[in-house]
Amino acid sequence: MRPNNRPVDQTRPVKITRNYTRYAEGSVLVEFGETKVLCNATVEETVPRFLKGQQQGWVTAEYGMLPRATHSRTQREAAKGKQGGRTMEIQRLIARSLRAVVDLKALGERTITVDCDVIQADGGTRTASITGACVALHDAINKLIADGLLKENPMKGLVAAISVGIVDGQAVCDLEYVEDSNAETDMNVVMVEDGRLVEVQGTAEGEPFSHMELLQLLDLAQKGIEQLFEAQRQALNATSDAIR
């Protein structure tokens, strides 16, 4: 039996709150159940040196966890003096996922950085980050259009991500921490709206998984991500504004 008696193909309750903080061009609090991530998108009128003169922009991301985002305090990476390998892997994944839905030429010579800060972690922090960051990026780009800095929308659609896995021999969608820590197979899937895949990260933690199980997990991921796309669309169509 899953936590909260969830069906195997159902995501946790998903909540996306736009305009969560005051200063960022795009700001979203995304919640996958008890996992909560703040995603802030910042626009800078410059590009990395390797793109100077290339007539295109850049989208990148940074990721971090607050010290008490987990059950016990974790030292800030700034205090350690360097980022961990997991952090660098996740922020690169977020950035690649966002670039998959942006026409960098149409963005112009500017950079959008999305900072994803995990407030509370209960599994799926990277997938929640991607899903929330997409909405924050959308809002930042819309501000550029509203301010007359862009003539056309460089965003080609939505991107979202979800975790799937095999727990106690059962394929399940959107794993909570207690499931993730006991999964025989753990997989993260990133997808755009037309069903094409951006990235698949899958690992057998114990028993290897079969080709048939891989296809089953991908089908389960697609069904879960469709639920996330719907949550994104609802948030973007709403007049949600957390700032008063």
UniProtKB/Swiss-Prot annotation:
It comes from the Bacteria. It holds the Pfam family RNase_PH_C. Gene3D superfamilies: GHMP Kinase, N-terminal domain. The lineage of its organism: Bacteria, Pseudomonadati, Pseudomonadota, Gammaproteobacteria, Pasteurellales. It comes from Glaesserella parasuis serovar 5 (strain SH0165) (Haemophilus parasuis). Keywords: Nucleotidyltransferase, RNA-binding, rRNA processing, Transferase, tRNA processing, tRNA-binding. Its EC number is 2.7.7.56. One of its GO terms (biological process) is rRNA catabolic process. It catalyses: tRNA(n+1) + phosphate = tRNA(n) + a ribonucleoside 5'-diphosphate. It is an enzyme of class 2 (transferase). Phosphorolytic 3'-5' exoribonuclease that plays an important role in tRNA 3'-end maturation. Removes nucleotide residues following the 3'-CCA terminus of tRNAs; can also add nucleotides to the ends of RNA molecules by using nucleoside diphosphates as substrates, but this may not be physiologically important. Probably plays a role in initiation of 16S rRNA degradation (leading to ribosome degradation) during starvation. One of its GO terms (molecular function) is tRNA binding. This is Ribonuclease PH.
